[in-house]
Amino acid sequence: MLYDLAHPLAEQFFLFNLFRYITFRSGAACMTALIVSFLLGPALIRWLKSVQRGGQPIREDGPERHLLEKKGTPTMGGVLILAATGISTLLWTDLRNGYVWAVLLLTLGYGGIGFADDYLKLSKRNTKGLPGRVKLIGQAVIGLIAAIWIMSLTRDPLSTGLAIPLLKDVLIPLGFAFPLFGMLVAMGASNAVNLTDGLDGLAIVPTIIAAGVFALIAYLVGNHVFATYLQLNEVAGTGELTVFCSALIGAGLGFLWFNAPPARVFMGDTGSLALGGALGGVAIATKHEIVLAIVGGLFVVETISVIVQVFWYKRTGRRVFLMAPLHHHFEKKGWPESTIVIRFWIVSFILALAGLATLKIR
């Protein structure tokens, strides 16, 4: 909105010329989201505590100390992330850009599904929430619409192509299967972040790191000069997603202020499903879906641990891990929560560097 207001004045007042630069608006978006989080956070947490007298329902079969340490902590803090990201994005992006709206659809749509899930968990006082089938159908519909939208904005042959990291000029044509592929990327990213969100600060920092990587990727592939130099597939218009990712980073940092151990609020499915959807949407738009699996490798491993646990238990009646997802396995082994969280952050940072390396190694 501010971009649209300032752009016509850029010729008369040189300060307004700053609004033309994605880098300036990205920094402003990050700071705006951070400030919004700080301003809204305390009041939102007080309100959530007042309406959620028992806090987030805790799994009875989970680590025993969760029943003692985390009981009574309110959930649905993802509302704060969505509000800060949404306000900042609307203020600082070029609202004529279709990629921004497609990614916002995924973010807010998946956040809405998570909100309904959290609400049902609280109202029924159990950990079930929305039926799994209903949740997946909702995610599939929103993901499919967003993927088709993004495909319609992208030039051929990129619109339906899958780029392979490390290999230049290699584009696998998916054709009419691309919307289904994009849908699966969005759903997979969303649910992977959701599974990772089990300890204070565990999911939000890897999300911030991934958003930082994709802010850079969006800037590079949206810029003809940089995309040509690095031999990346140029996707005109995706530079605006740098502003969105920056807003996401600011909102994530603001949320971490309140989610740092011991957490005053949990993001709930409202936040985790939305964050994963946002990352998936940016990856689809920038044609870096496989790089997302590298940068978000922690989320991938957490998801695989659940799949392996369920599959092996159904086949043999035995468990591979003491408890899934993987972070609970280490809890059961006696690792302190802070140790697990910080080590997982370090792994995320290393994976982010690996993902960034694919941009140069060709």
Curated annotation (Swiss-Prot):
Catalyzed reaction equations: UDP-N-acetyl-alpha-D-muramoyl-L-alanyl-gamma-D-glutamyl-meso-2,6-diaminopimeloyl-D-alanyl-D-alanine + di-trans,octa-cis-undecaprenyl phosphate = di-trans,octa-cis-undecaprenyl diphospho-N-acetyl-alpha-D-muramoyl-L-alanyl-D-glutamyl-meso-2,6-diaminopimeloyl-D-alanyl-D-alanine + UMP
Leading EC class: transferase
Annotated gene: mraY
Major localization class: membrane
Protein name per UniProt: Phospho-N-acetylmuramoyl-pentapeptide-transferase
CC annotations in GO: plasma membrane
A molecular function (GO) term: metal ion binding
Task performed by this protein: Catalyzes the initial step of the lipid cycle reactions in the biosynthesis of the cell wall peptidoglycan: transfers peptidoglycan precursor phospho-MurNAc-pentapeptide from UDP-MurNAc-pentapeptide onto the lipid carrier undecaprenyl phosphate, yielding undecaprenyl-pyrophosphoryl-MurNAc-pentapeptide, known as lipid I.
Presence of the UniProt keyword Magnesium in the record: yes
Record bears the keyword Membrane: yes
